[in-house]
């Protein structure tokens, strides 16, 4: 293991030793050294690859080392932001980190440009989460059926689709547009 349990993000240890990076199979992975298993530290490489492919032209290719580098950067970024948010929660004597804590940490650490789109996302998420909690309390989903019947096809799920569309529009900066080989956001 390259990292000790108390070293968020790796502390400079190299992962070029041929170890699997979310490649599936390879059960276990932890040798009992007390560190975090690599598959627990990193997001799956397939997910990283899928996200990266959305940002390049359809015929573009991404080298394996580029995917692995982004995979490690994402892990480091998550640790960096979460650590700052955790420190804030400890100072405020709270045990749970919430979305607002993460946004505060991002602003504190210099990622101000991402705050507004993430606030939009967080608001939409909370609205949708609230709707799903109400539906879950109804048991078998009869609330949706009642709404469908009394409003002629206008249901809370249709509202959810509208919210998802608003979310997709708000986060459109993440999917660059390509015109004649040029990238524009």
From Swiss-Prot:
* Tagged with keyword Transcription: yes
- GO biological-process terms attached to the record: regulation of transcription by RNA polymerase II
CDD domains under this entry? HFD_NFYB (cd22907)
Ranges where the record places region Disordered: 1-39, 145-164
A Pfam family reported for this protein in Swiss-Prot or TrEMBL:
CBFD_NFYB_HMF
| GO CC annotation | CCAAT-binding factor complex
Subcellular compartments? Nucleus
Q: Which domain of life is it from?
A: Eukaryota
- Tissue-level expression: Ubiquitous.
Which molecular function terms from Gene Ontology are attached?
DNA-binding transcription activator activity, RNA polymerase II-specific; DNA-binding transcription factor activity, RNA polymerase II-specific; protein heterodimerization activity; sequence-specific DNA binding
> Keywords of this protein's UniProt record, alphabetized?
Activator, DNA-binding, Nucleus, Transcription, Transcription regulation
Which part of the chain engages DNA, per the record? 43-49
Gene3D superfamilies found in the cross-reference section = Histone, subunit A
Just give the chief location class.
Answer: nucleus
- Biased amino acid composition, Gly residues: 1-36
Q: Which intervals carry biased composition (Low complexity)?
A: 153-164
Extract the signal peptide range.
none
Subunit association domain (SAD): annotated segments: 70-81
- Return the InterPro entries for the record: CBFA_NFYB_domain, Histone-fold, Transc_fact_NFYB/HAP3, Transcrpt_fac_NFYB/HAP3_CS
Q: How does this protein assemble?
A: Heterotrimeric transcription factor composed of three components, NF-YA, NF-YB and NF-YC. NF-YB and NF-YC must interact and dimerize for NF-YA association and DNA binding.
Can you tell me which family this protein belongs to?
Belongs to the NFYB/HAP3 subunit family.
Please describe what this protein does. Answer: Component of the NF-Y/HAP transcription factor complex. The NF-Y complex stimulates the transcription of various genes by recognizing and binding to a CCAAT motif in promoters. May regulate the expression of photosynthetic genes, and may be involved in chloroplast and amyloplast development.
Please give the name of this protein. Nuclear transcription factor Y subunit B-3
* Species the sequence originates in: Oryza sativa subsp. japonica (Rice)
Q: What is the lineage of its organism?
A: Eukaryota, Viridiplantae, Streptophyta, Embryophyta, Tracheophyta
